């Protein structure tokens, strides 16, 4: 693929803009170093379709994060334009980005996923559901994780260990999405499982050890805030179980994923 024109799409208008731009610039630099003609397009600064029409690309390298970049939006647009792009097809992106849909698909397929309840922002606003919030803990248990249903980079994610913390955590999640998930907290070793190629060749498991205990936005993007071990420090049987669960997730279009190995 030497010398191919490649448009790196990064930035956008989401809260993950800065992270996306950092990644996009690194990709562009690496591609140019390999002899390609790569340039960066930021949808917040340019009209994407007009820019792609004016300077055609053989490939669009997607480095957008969050809404529009990971939810199938830009993928559907590029499909309409007949342009090739990196990453997952539009429908798979849409399903994986929506945690409510993704967890429901996993549960129906028999893939382990922590118990959860969904708190819709409209139910709080229009139906007086706020008084029912404590009942979520009756289903899930006191220790839980609250997260936006549609967001990335762990923005709006909170760990709740007291009932008094729940309302604030839900409102924080709803600032990033129209619904919040209250999910049972799982204690264990956190690992990321990845695959490459159509044959789903397994990459080494990555063990994730955030120093403050929660793998939130700061832990992901602050240098030194998290330790990573590759391969993960798991025995062979547990590692195999994790890979099998992650591979099953790809079958139902809800990978990539992060798993906790108990």
What are the language-model segments listed below?
Residues 105-113, 172:
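Basic phosphate/pyrophosphate-binding loop/patch that engages nucleotide-derived ligands
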Residues 161-244, 249, 254:
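Phosphate-binding site of ATP-dependent enzymes
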Residues 39-45, 182-184, 254-262:
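A short glycine-rich, hydrophobically flanked beta-strand micro-motif that places a catalytic Asp/Glu
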Residues 131-132, 136, 252-260:
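Peripheral (often C-terminal) accessory segments that flank ATP-dependent C-N-forming ligase machineries
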Residues 20, 114-118, 143-168, 190-192, ...:
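Glycine-rich phosphate-binding loop of ATP-grasp-fold ATP-dependent ligases
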Residues 1-104, 108, 120-134:
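ATP-binding N-terminal substructure of ATP-dependent carboxylate-amine bond-forming enzymes
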Residues 106-107, 136-155, 178-187, 191:
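ATP-grasp fold ATP-binding core
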